[in-house]
Amino acid sequence: MDDMAENAGISARKLLFLPYLMGERTPHLDPNARGAFIGLSAIHERGDMIRAIMEGVSYSLADCLSVLDEMGVRPEKMLACGGGGTSALWRQMLADIYGMSVSTVDSKEAPALGVAILAMVGAGIYSTVQEACEKILRLKTTTAPIAENSEKYAKVYAIYKALYPHLKNDFGALAEL
């Protein structure tokens, strides 16, 4: 699937996906929000739809990151694991959209390792999460953002961000049917 999505290129030939399949919680807090393809036409193929879904989920996560930005917290790097973390294309997409490096951890059970790290901090084995991560985590791959891609994604993300406010009332009306 990565090959098909990669061939579609950034913006999936002008196709956007809103990933609100079960409403939206952050930052919109709207249980009526629904998923949608915007810009779908007869020219689009499976790869375009896959790419649009990947980008839509990435933009949704960028919305979550914007909440941290508003609180004055800006991560400098990201760790990816599991499903999307195994995709080199998705890691590059995340790095480009967020403007930060995305690394994978050399662990097949990274989520469980994260829980173990939190437990060790809670038990006093390490004094901070940062200290525990520095001692325990081993990075496997690191993907740096590509400035040219970041510029392209920023233009698409601006359109993505404008869609929810335009559709909010329609989502509500649809829920009332």
Feature-to-residue mapping (PLM):
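Glycine/Thr-rich phosphate-binding loops that ligate phosphate moieties of nucleotide
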Residues: 1-177
